[in-house]
Structures are given as C-alpha cells and as structure tokens.
C-alpha cells in the first residue's frame, strides 16, 4: 500500500505528460518558456486571482511574498508553531521575528482569538498577555549573522542593517521587545483553509498584512472562495506530495495587487528591472522551470476530478472510523483539499502502538508534525521555553519519551500545538486509494477502545 500513489496518476496522464515534455524539448525554452505563462494564467483563473507568479518552490513563494511586502528586521510576523519549518524559516531569513500563535484544536489552524492576544502582547511588550520570544535585537543579530549581515547601531541604540531605515521608529511601538506587528501567515494545514474571515478582521484592526500559506490546501475552499485567493498574497507549493504536485520543486504566488505582482516577478529573477541586467532590488533565483510547468499543466487537466476523488476517500474514512478514533472535522462552508488525513490518538503511547500495528499490517503512516517549531533547535534563539531547544532535546532523550516529541516537563506555552504533536498521525491519502484498502486500515484500528473526546487545554 502506498501512502501517496503517484504511479496511478501517472498512468492516467502518461500520454499527455510525454507530449508536454516533448514539446518543451522541441522548443528548448527551459527558462521562462511559454508553458510557464500558460500555467500561471490557468491557475490564476482557477483560483480567481488577478495575478499568478510561478516560482521555484513553495518556500520561495513565501520568501518572495515577504520580500515584496518589505518585511525585515524589527518586524513581527505571526504564524503557527504547528507546521513545516518553511513558514517560519522565511521570516527568519529576512531578519524578521516569528511570533508563534497557538492553533484551534478542531481545525489545527491558527486560532484567531489567540492571534488577537499575541498582537496585544507584542504591542505592549508584555509576555503576561501571551508568550513572546526574547528581544528582537538578539534574535535578528543571531539570524542575520548566519547569512553574513552585520547589524549596526543607530544613535537611538536601535539595531538595523540600515541606520536610515524607516522602520527604526515604528519598530519601537513594540516596546522593549523592539517588534512592530507587520504580518500574519496562517497555514492551511492538511488541506483545510484557515478561518480567513476572522483572521482578516483581526489583521485589519491592527494593520497587518495577511499572507496565505496554501502549500497544502490548493484545491480547497472556504465559503465558495478557493484556497490561494486569501490575503494580500497567497502562496502554494507543487512539491510532488502536494494535491497538485510536479516532479521536482515548484511553487506559485497569487495576488490581486498589480504593484505586488510586479515586485514578485522582479524578485524571482534577481530583482530584475525592465532590462535583463538592470537590477532594481535585491531578489533571488526563484524561477519556475518550464519542464515543471509543462508537467503541472498535464496534471492540472485532471486536478478538479482528483479533488472530488479525495472527497470520496475522506468520506469513506469518516464512515469507517466513526466512533473508533478522532477523525478530522471540516467546518460548514469549507472544503479540504485533503493533502493529509490526520487522526488524534489519546496520547503518544497509543499513537506509537497504533502506528506499529498499521505498519505490521502493511499500512504506511506519517506524523505531521512531531515537534512544534518553538521546540526546534533552529529557533532556540527565540527562547520560548527558557531553555535552548538543544537542552530540551537532551532532556527529552534522558527521560526516554517518544523520539522527537515535546518534553512534557517544559512549560506548554502553546498547549494545543504541543498536545497535537504528541497525538497526531496520518493515514494514506490520495485520489486512487481503494475502498478495500481503507477497510483494511479500519479493521486494524477498530479493536482499540472507544475514542475519548479531546478537550481544549487551559492556558
């Protein structure tokens, strides 16, 4: 049994794939070939966005979005700790500070009520309101030094790469922590769009830009609006395992803003201006390869049907596993792209036992994600837990807890994220998963005791 069956998909579209690839080989425009623009136009129309800008990966899409919004040192960017590292990584690469916000226990997406508290905490520099990272100056210095940027000190004692940067005064709105709330990146986890109505309202009240991380949700919907159409810029990934995936790395940004679209197109080609060798800003090498665009065009021809098939697979799981284990909840008005089908065990011991039982029965599983980002060594400088992540890892190992799981002895600053990290695991999910395979999975799981309801942990 495959966790994701790309071979079944390939068999369906092998002729179209071969034709599209052969066409690229014939015209030889491997960079910025016509297929790139064709794909951008097709996906912009599908999402309902004015502009689509292809790029080299989902990570590059997020990085380009923040660069277009001029996010940098002194800026606080809010996001969830329960996601893949790329979301917070790009914030750090630009010298900004990721401020983590806990998730909703039902949807696993960023909780708008917690976002409101986190913004208030940053504005007042008060971790009693909500957990905050350590001072921005120290975090920025550590992160920027790693990429060769040295912070300078201006006459007010503020640290910034440019002493004339207009952010210097505004950043002090965050008080001693030195952060200015600038943006929020909700993550559409497992294929389900976040609550953009509520998040957008919070962001609007505080003047924050919303950047949608739709890496897992392309094909999903929220109240009739497609994933990829929320926020000032939305970003998605075409990593092979995604609902719409290529045969390598690729990504895309979506926006309705003409100025931001122009900036994104410039940033992806080293900050290029109107002339090939006229560079008007700092950019990256983030172009979408023509071959990957051609592959995505072939896959997109059956993508709407595959999204419908994913709904059928999810419904079968729901029916087979009802009353056996905690299954995903899709709120009214939402449609998941079902990048993953994730379950909650009672605790990490039960999760490990269930995964072992499935493995012995020939069923692959995965954990997304075993350790929240604030516990990762890469973000040790944020010091959310009062210890470095390395110390926390050592403590965890010495207590023989589950490998990679958060240390239960440390303060649960983000209790929902940490609880989910100890309990969550995912089953095979793809459009070609047969009912017989799902019945086998359910049979392996149904001998466990009835599910105990999950209650929100108290902060």
Which residues fall in each region the model found?
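Active-site phosphate-binding strand-loop segment of PLP-dependent enzymes
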Residues: 106-246, 252-254
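Phosphate-binding glycine-rich loop
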Residues: 29-76, 90-94, 99-102, 124-154, ...
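Conserved PLP-binding active-site segment in aminotransferase class I/II-type PLP enzymes
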Residues: 1-68, 72, 93, 156, ...
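Hydrophobic "anchor" residues on beta-strands that sit immediately upstream
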Residues: 1, 75-76, 208-209
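Conserved coil-to-alpha-helix start sites within the AMP-binding
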Residues: 83-88
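PLP-dependent aminotransferase class I/II
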Residues: 36-41, 50, 113, 133, ...
């Amino acid at each position: 049994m495959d966790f994701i069956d790309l071979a079944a998909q390939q068999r369906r579209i092998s002729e179209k794939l071969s034709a599209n690839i052969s066409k690229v080989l014939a015209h030889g425009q491997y960079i910025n070939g016509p297929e790139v623009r064709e794909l951008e136009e097709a996906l912009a129309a599908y999402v309902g966005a004015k502009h689509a800008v292809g790029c080299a990966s989902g990570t590059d899409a997020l990085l380009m979005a923040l660069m277009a919004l001029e996010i940098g040192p002194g800026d606080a960017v809010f996001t969830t700790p329960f996601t893949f590292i790329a979301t917070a990584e790009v914030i750090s690469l630009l010298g900004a500070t990721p401020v983590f916000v806990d998730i909703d226990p039902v949807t696993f997406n960023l909780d708008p009520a917690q976002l409101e508290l986190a913004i208030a905490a940053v504005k007042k520099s008060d971790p009693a309101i909500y957990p905050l990272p350590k001072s921005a100056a120290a975090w920025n210095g550590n992160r920027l030094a790693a990429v060769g940027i040295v912070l300078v000190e201006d006459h007010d004692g503020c640290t910034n790469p440019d002493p004339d940067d207009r952010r210097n005064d505004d950043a002090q709105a965050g008080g001693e922590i030195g952060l200015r709330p600038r943006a929020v990146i909700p993550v559409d986890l497992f294929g389900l769009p976040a609550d953009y109505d509520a998040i957008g309202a919070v962001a609007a009240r505080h003047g924050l830009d919303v950047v949608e991380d739709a890496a897992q949700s392309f094909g999903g919907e929220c109240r009739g609006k497609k994933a990829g159409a929320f926020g000032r810029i939305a970003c998605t990934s075409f990593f092979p395992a995604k609902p719409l995936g290529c045969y390598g790395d690729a990504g895309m940004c979506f926006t309705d803003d003409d100025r931001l679209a122009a900036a994104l197109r410039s940033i992806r080609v080293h900050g290029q201006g109107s002339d090939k060798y006229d560079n008007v800003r700092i950019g990256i090498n983030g172009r979408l390869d023509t071959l990957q665009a051609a592959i995505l065009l072939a896959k997109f021809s059956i993508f709407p049907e595959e999204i419908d098939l994913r709904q059928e697979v999810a419904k079968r799981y729901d029916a087979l596993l009802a009353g056996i284990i905690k299954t995903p909840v899709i709120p009214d008005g939402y449609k998941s792209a079902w990048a993953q089908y994730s379950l909650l065990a009672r605790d990490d011991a039960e999760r490990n036992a269930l995964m072992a039982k499935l493995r012995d029965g020939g069923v692959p599983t995965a954990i997304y994600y075993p350790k929240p980002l604030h516990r990762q060594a890469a973000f040790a400088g944020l010091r959310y837990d009062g210890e470095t992540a390395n110390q926390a890892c050592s403590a965890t190992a010495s207590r023989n807890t589950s490998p990679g799981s958060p240390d239960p002895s440390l303060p649960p600053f983000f209790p929902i994220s940490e609880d989910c990290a100890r309990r969550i695991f995912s089953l095979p999910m793809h459009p070609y998963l047969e009912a017989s395979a799902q019945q086998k999975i359910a049979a392996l799981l149904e001998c466990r005791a009835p599910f105990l309801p999950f209650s929100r942990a108290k902060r």
